[in-house]
């Protein structure tokens, strides 16, 4: 009798459910990552678009939570870890890819749908100028309520100029919904919200799946800049650093040579320019007290002092600019990461 009761019980299980569990079990075993997404309020036709987009990269299944639980147990997954996420209508995404990269796709991949009552505009909702294709009639009063200027031409309603019917954050007027649909305007964005990812035994909640790529990039750039500045300061011998270090040392050497009057082919011009500037300055200082017997070229003096001042400014700028440029940072990061 027990065997008969068991056989009758087994017959009550629909064959499609057995096939579904079998397929799910194989998908779980052959996937490195499983993501569970919330299907509540998500349009079915948009899910079809996602399937097409992820073809070859992931398998998307809409199934009952109970069947997934059975399949997960069959595949050796501790279902208790996922129990809290298996409520309401869900979609299951099976992939071999990294869970963070896959979640990033869903974060960035937004789809449009027609507006429904109560929807808020994420951007300006505009009824464009031109032929609406709608026959003149009661619809004119609807356009009037929306303050959209119209005219009737060849029995059709024409919008005179582009008109904003909702600004970002505004509830889209109910009167505008049928018009927007007839014009094929989809002002609302939707995206599939991921609840959790299961990756090789690790449960990763949705809030932990989000990556701040701009923040990471900024941190790496800042770290590279600081490291480069320190390397230049201590003359750390690497090809990228030495290029800046040698230039800095050369300028310091020229500045020192011009200060002490040490003449070399490289420093001669700087030494002579500095000496001439000092001579003019001294002559100017004592010219009022002693007749030097020469006429001081005051214009030349100011001109000769100006390059020296500009040279000092340039040297000061070079001293302040201890870090590499944006192009050099990008080049360095490229070589760092291959």
Swiss-Prot record:
Pfam families: Ribosomal_L10, RL10P_insert
Any one biological process term the GO annotation gives: cytoplasmic translation
InterPro entries named in the record: Ribosomal_protein_uL10, Ribosomal_uL10, Ribosomal_uL10-like_insert, Ribosomal_uL10-like_insert_sf, Ribosomal_uL10-like_sf, Ribosomal_uL10_arc
Keywords tagged on the record: Ribonucleoprotein, Ribosomal protein, RNA-binding, rRNA-binding
Alphabetical list of SUPFAM superfamilies matching this protein: Ribosomal protein L10-like (SSF160369)
The keyword rRNA-binding belongs to this UniProt entry's keyword annotation: yes
Biased composition (Basic and acidic residues): 309-325
Family annotation (Gene3D superfamilies): 3.30.70.1730, 3.90.105.20, 6.10.140.760
Keyword flag Ribosomal protein: yes
Domain of life: Archaea
Disordered: region residues: 298-338
CC per GO annotation: cytosolic large ribosomal subunit
GO molecular function: large ribosomal subunit rRNA binding; structural constituent of ribosome
Functional note: Forms part of the ribosomal stalk, playing a central role in the interaction of the ribosome with GTP-bound translation factors.
Other information: Was called L10e in this organism; in this case 'e' is for E.coli-like, not eukaryotic-type protein.
Subunit relationships: Part of the 50S ribosomal subunit. Forms part of the ribosomal stalk which helps the ribosome interact with GTP-bound translation factors. Forms a heptameric L10(L12)2(L12)2(L12)2 complex, where L10 forms an elongated spine to which the L12 dimers bind in a sequential fashion.
HAMAP family the UniProt entry points to: Ribosomal_uL10_arch (MF_00280)
Family: Belongs to the universal ribosomal protein uL10 family.
NCBIfam families recorded: PRK04019.1-1 (NF003095)
Name the record gives this protein: Large ribosomal subunit protein uL10
Species this protein is from: Saccharolobus solfataricus (strain ATCC 35092 / DSM 1617 / JCM 11322 / P2)
């Amino acid at each position: 009798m027990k065997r008969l009761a068991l056989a009758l019980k087994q017959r009550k299980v629909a064959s499609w459910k057995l096939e579904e569990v079998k397929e799910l079990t194989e998908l779980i075993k052959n996937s490195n990552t499983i993501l569970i997404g919330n299907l509540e309020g998500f349009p079915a036709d948009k899910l079809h678009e996602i399937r097409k987009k992820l073809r070859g990269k992931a398998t998307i299944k809409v199934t009952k939570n109970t069947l997934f639980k059975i399949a997960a147990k069959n595949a050796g997954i501790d279902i208790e870890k996922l129990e809290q996420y298996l409520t309401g209508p869900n979609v299951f995404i099976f992939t071999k890819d990294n869970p963070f990269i896959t979640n990033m796709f869903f974060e960035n991949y937004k789809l449009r749908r027609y507006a429904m009552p109560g929807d808020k505009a994420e951007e300006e909702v505009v009824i464009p100028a031109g032929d609406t294709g709608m026959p003149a009639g009661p619809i004119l009063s609807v356009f009037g309520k929306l303050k959209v200027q119209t005219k009737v031409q060849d029995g059709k309603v024409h919008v005179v100029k582009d008109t904003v019917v909702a600004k970002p954050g505004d509830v889209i007027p109910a009167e505008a919904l049928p018009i927007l649909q007839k014009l094929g305007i989809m002002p609302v964005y939707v995206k599939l919200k991921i609840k959790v990812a299961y990756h090789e035994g690790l449960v990763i909640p949705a809030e932990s799946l989000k990556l701040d790529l701009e923040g990471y990039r900024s941190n790496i750039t800042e770290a590279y800049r600081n490291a480069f500045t320190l390397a230049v300061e201590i003359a750390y011998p690497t090809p990228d650093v030495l290029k800046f270090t040698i230039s800095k040392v050369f300028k310091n050497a020229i500045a020192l040579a011009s200060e002490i009057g040490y003449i070399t082919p490289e420093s001669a011009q700087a030494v002579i320019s500095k000496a001439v500037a000092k001579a003019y300055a001294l002559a100017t200082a004592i010219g009022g007290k002693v007749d030097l017997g020469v006429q001081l070229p005051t214009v030349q003096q100011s001109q000769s002092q100006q390059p020296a001042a500009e040279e000092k400014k340039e040297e000061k700028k070079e001293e302040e600019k201890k870090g590499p440029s944006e192009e050099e940072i990008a080049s360095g990061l490229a070589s760092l990461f291959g």
